[in-house]
Amino acid sequence: MNSVGEECTDMKRDYDQCFNRWFAEKFLKGAGSGDPCTELFRRYRECVQKAIKDKDIPVDGVDFMGPSKSKTESDGSS
């Protein structure tokens, strides 16, 4: 599948290959302490964010996944 930005498609492919290789060869075998693809993901995410902005795609109300976001809805306080 191509990326939202044509200029990001190669980065997406590189990240997908890196992640799939790490997942199959390390994580599923219990040797997955850390994701070696973090930098590829960061560059791809930045490219996608730029493409969304450049194409003026509305994203209001959309939750984005990523290491900088965390859900605190169920923090145990009532």
Swiss-Prot record:
Disulfide bonds join 8-47, 18-37. It holds the Pfam family UPF0203. The keyword Transport applies. It is found in: Mitochondrion; Mitochondrion intermembrane space. A motif (Cx9C motif 1) lies at residues 8-18. Residues 1-52 form a coiled coil. It catalyses: a 1,2-diacyl-sn-glycero-3-phosphate(in) = a 1,2-diacyl-sn-glycero-3-phosphate(out). One of its GO terms (molecular function) is phosphatidic acid transfer activity. InterPro entries: MDM35_apoptosis. PROSITE patterns: CHCH (PS51808). Monomer. Forms a complex with prelid1 in the mitochondrion intermembrane space. Interacts with prelid3a. Belongs to the TRIAP1/MDM35 family. Involved in the modulation of the mitochondrial apoptotic pathway by ensuring the accumulation of cardiolipin (CL) in mitochondrial membranes. The triap1:prelid1 complex probably functions as a phosphatidic acid (PA) transporter across the mitochondrion intermembrane space to provide PA for cardiolipin CL synthesis in the inner membrane. Likewise, the triap1:prelid3a complex mediates the transfer of phosphatidic acid (PA) between liposomes (in vitro) and probably functions as a PA transporter across the mitochondrion intermembrane space (in vivo). PANTHER family: TP53-REGULATED INHIBITOR OF APOPTOSIS 1 (PTHR46403:SF1). This is TP53-regulated inhibitor of apoptosis 1-A. It comes from Xenopus laevis. The gene is triap1-a.
